[in-house]
């Protein structure tokens, strides 16, 4: 029976969150086996199809179908309402130092925009990674550093307004730049050094977008930001 309890899951390790967008979970093997798995509503089907048992399913339960055959060990948290998305409902209840999301990119564009809106509205500073078939992206607040192959694409997307004071390792430096949607963004840059550093000024945070093959490097950077290195 679904619960409406809103007691958060307080975790000391990263969490894996699976959404309902099509995904083969490529890259999930890079996550440690002890990281707990959560499902956002219909993401339950993807998790079970890949032999992953979520600790909990969170959402408005409009996409999960019949629940009576589920393992009773899976907690069902039913949150009604259309004023927030299942992704937002999950992030509000999963208090982990890092969240790695699969199944939130690559399907409907309006859903992807809703995901970015949620990341822009978060008040905390934890890194959040989203894994897609072609891209991986990470929400960042503050400075960050990456160890990357030379000549790959490197994009920055502001979550509101974000300034940068200094950068290293990019073909087109973002030193002194203030990014804002509709005015200035930082897509389609290129890595020219194996170490890329970004020193951020005041702002609302930003997304770092890389090719999907760079998930290992993105995870490494995220674990450092989450003080889990």
Enumerate the predicted regions with their spans:
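N-terminal nucleotide-binding beta1-loop-alpha1 segment
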Residues: 1-22
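Acidic/Gly/His-enriched mid-domain segments of enzyme catalytic cores or analogous surface patches
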Residues: 8, 31-33, 42-126, 131-133
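Short, hydrophobic beta-strand segments that form beta-sheet elements in well-ordered domains
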Residues: 15-19, 36-41, 54-61, 208-209
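Structural motif
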Residues: 18-22, 104-106, 133, 210-212
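Short N-terminal binding/cap micro-motifs at the start of the first secondary-structure element
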Residues: 24-28, 46, 216-217
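A short secondary-structure junction signal
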Residues: 27-29, 111-115, 140-143, 167-169
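Class I SAM-dependent methyltransferase SAM-binding "motif I" and its flanking Rossmann-like core
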Residues: 120, 124-149, 154
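Long, charged alpha-helical interface segments
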Residues: 140-229
């Amino acid at each position: 029976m679904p619960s409406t309890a809103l007691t958060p899951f307080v975790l000391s390790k990263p969490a894996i969150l699976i959404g309902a967008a099509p995904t083969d979970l490529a890259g999930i093997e890079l996550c440690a086996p002890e990281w707990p798995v959560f499902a956002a509503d219909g993401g339950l089907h993807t998790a079970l199809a890949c032999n992953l048992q979520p600790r909990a399913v969170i959402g408005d339960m409009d996409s999960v179908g019949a629940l009576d055959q589920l393992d009773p060990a899976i907690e069902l948290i039913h949150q009604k309402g259309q004023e927030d998305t299942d992704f937002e409902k999950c992030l509000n209840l999963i208090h982990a130092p890092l969240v790695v999301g699969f199944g939130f990119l690559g399907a409907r564009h309006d859903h992807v925009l809703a995901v970015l809106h949620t990341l822009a509205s978060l008040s905390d500073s934890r890194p959040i990674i989203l894994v897609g078939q072609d891209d991986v992206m990470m929400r960042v607040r503050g400075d960050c550093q990456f160890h990357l192959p030379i000549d790959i694409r490197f994009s920055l997307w502001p979550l509101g307004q974000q300034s940068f004071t200094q950068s290293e390792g990019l073909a087109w430096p973002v030193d002194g730049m203030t990014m804002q949607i509709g005015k200035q963004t930082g897509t389609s840059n290129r890595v020219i050094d194996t170490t890329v550093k970004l020193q951020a000024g005041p702002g609302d945070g930003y997304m770092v977008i890389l090719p999907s093959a760079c998930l290992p490097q993105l995870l490494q950077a995220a674990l450092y930001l989450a003080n889990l290195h």
